[in-house]
Amino acid sequence: MSVNADSQHSNNSSHQASEKAFDRARSLIPGGVNSPVRAFGSVGGTPPFITSAQGSTLHDVDGNSYVDLFCSWGPMIHGHAHPQIVEAVREAAGHGLSFGAPTTMEVDLVEEIDRRTSVEKARLVNSGTEATMSAIRLARGYTGRDKILKFEGCYHGHVDSLLVAAGSGVATFGLPDSPGITKAAAGDTVVVPYRDVQAVEDAFASHEGEIAAIIVEGAAGNMGTVNPRGFNAELQRIAHENGALLIVDEVMTGFRVSESGWYGKDGVAGDLTTFGKVVSGGLPAAAFGGKAEIMDHLAPVGPVYQAGTLSGNPVAVASGLASLKLADAAAYQTLDANADALAGILSDALTKASVAHHIQRAGSMLSVRFAEGEGANFADMKAADTFRYPAFFHAFLDHGVFAPPSVFETWFVSTALTGADFEKIAAAATPAAEAAAAATPSA
């Protein structure tokens, strides 16, 4: 879905500096952004160019302030510029930015990941994409098989084989995959509908002895939010019955929905698990881990090669450790309460405006489906009245609330949200719901 940029922003004068910055950026950076969904392609208009953020609030180059409800796409569970995290980063940077050698802090971070999850050993990398790419390679090396089974609408980073029928930014731009992905890469990817156990059984029957692993998000968050509702346990059973591994992608859910991620919700342990976002406190870092017997197939002790110049970067590791130290039981109670409050505000406003909707929930993650009833898969999420979202989004933005700029993205809350923030969200929700009600499908 594409929206004319000129059709949005009811108060263009308040975005003049962002418009100027965006024009300059487009002359130097493809699309003017370094990740496609930031370009507002599915909602139209000019993305605010952010200068700073504190707590629950983003500030842009025009002097506008916004309550943040996407939290840098997930990692900022404690809000922005938390003093303890900033101090940890400052202290680490003072000792050096990169060593290319082991540090005790990276061991500490992996130990904390292991303590909270089913992981026995883990390795640090630089992004969620790198984590899933490495987990896929390891699964293939360990099993001696080539094919990977994934689900329509689940996004696992921009790895070639995993962009087939992906969600997130790919869904935003209406692409089934991406040019540049070879037929061979696509051919090694088996895609079935999410939450369809029979389709998974049938795929293994059709590709007997060929599938190395199933990869699935802990809870789907890139087709909007879709709760697995027991699906992961079925995947674990099917994978193990067929000699395959289960890779649980917790880049989004890990340490966001509980102290132990989605594993803390359903108790389903992946043979391999990927982490990102919260694990880095907002800096570029991620991890993948799993059973020691599988992880020991990685070089230098095993034959599967994986490496990274900046992996285990001391500044990013310090940020991650500080973030996880703050992520205690009280923090998750606050996140859940804030998500409940947000969901209630959204639903109340849409109900009063007579807009058919369902608030999709997976722990403290949520999204709005503009149709009655829960969506269970990508087809359900696409079948809703997605045309209502651009008007809904921009009404919020014009009233100082920054929601995710795509109907297929998840809304995130932080512990930094205040009573005043919720008053602002509630005040914005009424015109946003009215705008959604008035929206019509484009020709």
From Swiss-Prot:
Entry's EC annotation: 5.4.3.8
InterPro entries cross-referenced by the UniProt entry: 4pyrrol_synth_GluAld_NH2Trfase (IPR004639), Aminotrans_3 (IPR005814), Aminotrans_3_PPA_site (IPR049704), PyrdxlP-dep_Trfase (IPR015424), PyrdxlP-dep_Trfase_major (IPR015421), PyrdxlP-dep_Trfase_small (IPR015422)
Region (Disordered) location: 1-22
Subcellular location: Cytoplasm
Any GO BP annotation: protoporphyrinogen IX biosynthetic process
Subunit relationships: Homodimer.
Gene Ontology, cellular component aspect: cytoplasm
UniProt modified residues of type N6-(pyridoxal phosphate)lysine: K277
Listed cofactors: pyridoxal 5'-phosphate
Keywords: Cytoplasm, Isomerase, Porphyrin biosynthesis, Pyridoxal phosphate
Pathway linked to the protein: Porphyrin-containing compound metabolism; protoporphyrin-IX biosynthesis; 5-aminolevulinate from L-glutamyl-tRNA(Glu): step 2/2
Similarity-based family: Belongs to the class-III pyridoxal-phosphate-dependent aminotransferase family. HemL subfamily.
Top-level EC class as recorded in UniProt: isomerase
Organism of derivation: Corynebacterium jeikeium (strain K411)
Catalytic activity, reaction form: (S)-4-amino-5-oxopentanoate = 5-aminolevulinate
Taxonomy, superkingdom: Bacteria
Pfam families in alphabetical order: Aminotran_3
GO molecular function: glutamate-1-semialdehyde 2,1-aminomutase activity; pyridoxal phosphate binding; transaminase activity
Ranges of Low complexity composition bias in the record: 1-16
Identification of the protein by name: Glutamate-1-semialdehyde 2,1-aminomutase
